[in-house]
């Protein structure tokens, strides 16, 4: 090979080697930049997550609204029944009314905010608090240990037990009268459902999600009896002909109270303080006489009403 050709070959080889080295450096530099960028993004994400976690710890669960947040919004959201006279229902004028609603209105007034009502069914009461759909539940809510694991109960304002209403042509005065083919109506999510399931598993239960559907089924004689809070079955029987509350107290004596989301301490404490003030002014006796007297009469007043702090 001539010297000229050897020189050309050497030049080509040198250029190729240079290109390889430069390409390698460029690739290495790009990889380092990507790595640095990834490390930076990872650090930023970590810092953001830590910040969000710290913020969540400072503000609570993020599900409920604190007392200050409710005040700042100018509105408190309260879950009540819309079809359960005389505790929570919508009257002929389209307004919420009833014993529970009297307390709800007063709490909003004392807090200095408007009230927004959200209609609830018995089975939704815990869920609405757990998801933050409402700030407070005021829907004939019986205090139980099981529920207290999921929500925080305020001080009670009413006494309650379970009761059983039946048709006048077959009055049930003892659960032993219920035959193996008979059914008892209950509403899903109530203490009546829990009690009968645990203590009388042989009794067949016909379950309904809503009070209105349970009432209609019972009126149509789809079951021999209807078990619910005694306050509710007494109200039902007193408001219609053909029914008798043969069992006025079943199980233990319990209480009814407002409930807030688990851990919402600021709202819980404020409600308890306000209810203690209401107890001092006999607010709950006044509310009874306004909304419940025509249903239960004067004889039940001191038995049912609880004045917090008194």
What is each stretch, according to the model?
Residues 58-140:
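Extracytoplasmic small-molecule ligand-binding "clamshell" domains
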Residues 26, 101-110, 169, 189-190, ...:
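Extended ligand-binding regions for polar small-molecule ligands
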Residues 116-128, 171, 188-191, 206-220:
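Short helix-initiation/N-cap motifs at beta->coil->alpha
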Residues 27, 58-61, 191-208, 245-249, ...:
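Ligand-binding clefts/hinges and TM-proximal coupling segments of bilobed small-molecule sensing domains
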Residues 7, 21-43:
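Bacterial lipoprotein signal-peptidase II cleavage site
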Residues 127, 141-149, 197-198, 219-220, ...:
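A ligand-binding cleft/hinge motif common to bilobed small-molecule-binding domains
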């Amino acid at each position: 090979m001539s010297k000229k050709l050897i020189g050309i070959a050497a030049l080509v080889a040198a250029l190729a080697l240079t290109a390889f080295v430069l390409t390698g450096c460029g690739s290495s530099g790009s990889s380092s930049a990507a790595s640095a960028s990834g490390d930076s993004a990872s650090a930023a994400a970590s810092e953001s997550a830590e910040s969000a976690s710290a913020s969540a710890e400072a503000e609570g669960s993020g599900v409920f609204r604190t007392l200050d947040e409710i005040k700042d919004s100018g509105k408190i959201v309260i879950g009540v029944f819309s079809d359960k006279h005389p505790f929570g229902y919508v009257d002929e004028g389209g307004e919420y009314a009833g014993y529970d609603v009297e307390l709800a209105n007063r709490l909003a007034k004392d807090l200095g905010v408007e009230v927004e009502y959200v209609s609830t069914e018995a089975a939704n009461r815990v869920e609405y608090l757990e998801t933050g759909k409402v700030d407070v539940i005021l829907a004939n809510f019986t205090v139980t240990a099981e529920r207290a694991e999921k929500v925080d109960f305020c001080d009670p304002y009413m006494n309650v037990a379970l009761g059983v209403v039946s048709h006048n042509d077959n009055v049930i005065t003892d659960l032993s009268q219920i035959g193996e083919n008979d059914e008892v109506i209950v509403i899903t999510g109530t203490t009546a459902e829990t009690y009968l399931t645990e203590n009388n598993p042989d009794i067949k239960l016909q379950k309904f999600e809503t009070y209105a559907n349970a009432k209609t089924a019972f009126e149509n004689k789809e079951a021999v009896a209807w078990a619910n809070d005694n306050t509710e079955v007494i109200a039902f029987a007193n408001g219609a002909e053909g029914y008798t509350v043969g069992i006025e107290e079943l199980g233990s004596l319990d209480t009814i109270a407002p409930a807030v989301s688990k851990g919402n301490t600021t709202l819980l404490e404020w409600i308890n303080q306000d209810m203690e003030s209401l107890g001092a002014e006999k607010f709950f006796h006044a509310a009874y006489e306004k909304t419940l007297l025509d249903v239960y009469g004067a004889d039940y007043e001191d038995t049912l009403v609880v004045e917090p702090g008194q």
